[in-house]
């Protein structure tokens, strides 16, 4: 073996020995249209690293995470970013092909806040199905879905921002231009009454959520269940998981595995939290949140240090929180925003440096060697949660908070936090379907993959 290769492996092995998982011991303590749910606001610049909090060390390092061979262990789906400056709005979408011969190229929103798959049909003629959109043309591989009376199934899908009317059927979907998902249940929209869609460039939604009451009633299988039950990923030696990465200009989904180049540092450990699927969302338990004031002017140049964190935290009373790739902002429980975070305000970009770090205390993946509840801590800096954008009218830089109170918690059945794309730009997030858990690791800024 080449001497240089031996040295590289030795260096990687040393890094593995030095790694540790960060956790904190705590003894005290649906209808989906995501961009819909909340007002989406513009463009975020993300930087700063995850603060290392060392309370306990574990030795079971997953070497595959470190030594995995990038594009060989996942399917890459590139996400394009669309900014609508007049509305301080941004969205990310990716391309899929539909039809056995890939006849239809469509742009879709990949939405963990939904279990529905729908696209615009070529019979949709109202103004919201305008010329910026691609529309599905029926293929030879299309099959109708029939209702109990033997008639083609027609449905209405209601969202907080409106509704769509669609007929149901089946066709083949290709992801990353090479992963084939045959006989996928799709709703083909013939009428759209969601005004905000008119300016978006995506043509439909691929829901990456779980089964809910609606999907059970309609007898449809969520997209992720198709991938798992039909062994579409595992038959090709991929995992039933996907990573979600966003940058200032674009993003990526790594379907079937992870890419360490998207981490802040390649050997940085992923920290995991268990997931509940009862509501159809990727639901996690946020146990509390606290503020930490630091000198943000110098934070980027500081060496990271291990910090012992106090056990106590503000408990916001809303544990069930969701990770939603289809929502742009972060939404806090209204009571939390009006009380504990009431001083979280910004009038100009200079005031960003006076804002605190926000530290989320999240239930950890079960670790049997620790007594009590294991808690992981996720840090958001002002650079993470303050949105910067350019006012085109005055050509000035403006700043707004990327965290807003959740005024719609009753409608979407979420009593805790909704962590949208503002959060996801700070953390490369791994959604593990097999083990029902989510992993977080600080993102490296503005990575470009080929």
UniProtKB/Swiss-Prot annotation:
Entry's Gene Ontology BP terms: proteolysis
InterPro entries in UniProt: Aspartic_peptidase_A1 (IPR001461), Pepsin-like_dom (IPR034164), PEPTIDASE_A1 (IPR033121), Peptidase_aspartic_dom_sf (IPR021109)
UniProt EC number: 3.4.23.-
SUPFAM superfamilies per the UniProt record, alphabetical: Acid proteases
Record's subcellular location: Cytoplasm
KW Nucleotide-binding (keyword) present: no
Active-site feature positions: 111, 324
Family indicated by similarity: Belongs to the peptidase A1 family.
Protein name in UniProt: Plasmepsin VII
């Amino acid at each position: 073996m080449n001497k240089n290769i031996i040295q590289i492996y030795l260096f990687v092995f040393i890094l593995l020995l030095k790694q540790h998982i960060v956790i904190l011991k705590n003894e005290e303590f649906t209808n989906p249209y995501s961009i819909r749910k909340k007002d989406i606001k513009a463009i975020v610049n993300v930087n700063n690293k995850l603060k290392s909090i060392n309370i306990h060390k574990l030795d079971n390092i997953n070497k595959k995470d470190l030594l995995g061979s990038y594009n060989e262990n996942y399917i890459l789906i590139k996400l394009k970013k669309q900014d609508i400056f007049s509305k301080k709005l941004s969205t990310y979408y990716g391309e899929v092909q539909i039809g056995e011969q890939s006849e239809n190229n469509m742009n879709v929103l990949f939405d963990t806040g939904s279990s529905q798959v729908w696209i615009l049909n070529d019979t949709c003629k109202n103004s919201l199905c305008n010329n910026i959109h691609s529309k599905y043309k029926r293929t030879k591989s299309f099959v109708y879905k029939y209702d109990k009376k033997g008639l083609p199934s027609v449905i209405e899908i209601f969202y907080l921002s409106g509704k769509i009317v669609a007929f149901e059927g089946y066709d083949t979907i290709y992801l990353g231009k090479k992963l084939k998902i045959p006989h996928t249940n799709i709703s083909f929209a013939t009428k759209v009454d969601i005004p905000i869609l008119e300016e978006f460039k995506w043509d439909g939604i691929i829901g990456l959520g779980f089964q809910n009451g609606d999907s059970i009633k309609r007898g449809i299988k969520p997209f992720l269940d198709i991938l798992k039950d039909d062994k579409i990923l595992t038959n090709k030696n991929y995992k039933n998981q996907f990573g979600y990465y966003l940058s200032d200009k674009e993003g990526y989904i790594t379907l079937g595995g992870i890419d360490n180049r998207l981490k802040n540092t390649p050997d940085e450990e992923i920290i995991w939290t268990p997931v509940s699927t009862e509501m159809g969302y990727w639901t996690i338990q946020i146990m509390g949140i606290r503020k930490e004031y630091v000198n943000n002017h110098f934070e980027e140049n500081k060496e990271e240090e291990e910090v012992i964190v106090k056990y106590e935290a503000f408990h916001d009373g809303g544990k069930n929180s969701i990770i939603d790739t289809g929502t742009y902002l972060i939404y806090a429980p209204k009571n939390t925003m009006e009380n504990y975070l009431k001083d979280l305000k910004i009038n100009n970009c200079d005031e960003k440096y006076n804002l605190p770090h926000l530290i989320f205390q999240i239930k950890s993946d079960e670790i049997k060697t620790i007594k009590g509840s294991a808690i992981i801590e996720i840090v958001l800096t002002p650079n993470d949660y303050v949105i910067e954008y350019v006012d085109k009218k005055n050509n000035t830089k403006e700043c707004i908070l990327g965290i807003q109170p959740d005024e719609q918690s009753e409608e979407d059945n979420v009593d805790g936090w909704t962590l949208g794309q503002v959060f996801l730009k700070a953390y490369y997030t791994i959604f593990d379907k097999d083990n029902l858990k989510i992993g977080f690791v600080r993102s490296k800024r503005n990575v470009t993959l080929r």
